[in-house]
Amino acid sequence: MIRIQKLSKTFDRTPVLTDLNMTIQTGSIYGLIGVNGAGKTTLIKHMSGMLKGDEGSITYDGEPIWENDTLKQCIGLIPDELYFPNGYSLRDMRSIYSGFYENWNEDRFHQLAGLFKLDEKAKIRTFSKGMKKQAAFCLVMATMPAYLLLDEPIDGLDPIVRKLVWKAIVDDVADRRMSVLVSSHNVKEMEGICDYIGILSHGRMLME
């Protein structure tokens, strides 16, 4: 279970997150809905341990995320803005991920790369935006995360690939009881895939 309690964050005297409470049950998919600027990306950065709230707490099955390297091994993150080192291929990135994540699954990586028809030897800089999303998905899912954080994960993907991505996520939730947070502004798509939905506006949870 992921639990966020009374989380608040201010940048340059501007509140970005305010007294935020949210719970993601184990083995469920939680959809976080909000327009651009609602605070979705900032919240995900806190949940991944990249930022620390001014107040409040974020725990994963009772463990705080901040400065917890052991817990971060169990968290998969696909941000909205992807970064890959210049000149690296998907195979190069595989070497980095497999050396860092203890639960790396080589078969899972190759299975997903084949599913998306990605050339592991090709330079990622030659990939389209959608292909880069698929590459990130292959890498992150192969770490076998217990918790998956996705920031606008389906932007730039065609309908067929979207279905493949969602199927892989749903299968892992069913098979491994993975817990998932998905942020999006697409209410219709979230309603069809998520167990729970929260609506975020100006850093506050309006409705769950």
Regions found by a protein language model. Give the residues of each.
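Conserved structural motif at the start of ABC-family nucleotide-binding domains
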Residues: 2, 17-19, 72
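The feature captures the beta-strand-to-loop junction immediately N-terminal to the Walker
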Residues: 30-35
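Helix-to-loop junction immediately C-terminal to a conserved catalytic motif
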Residues: 48
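ABC-family P-loop ATPase nucleotide-binding domains
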Residues: 79-135
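Catalytic Walker B motif of ABC-type/P-loop ATPase nucleotide-binding domains
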Residues: 148-152
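Helical segment within the ABC ATPase nucleotide-binding domain
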Residues: 163-176
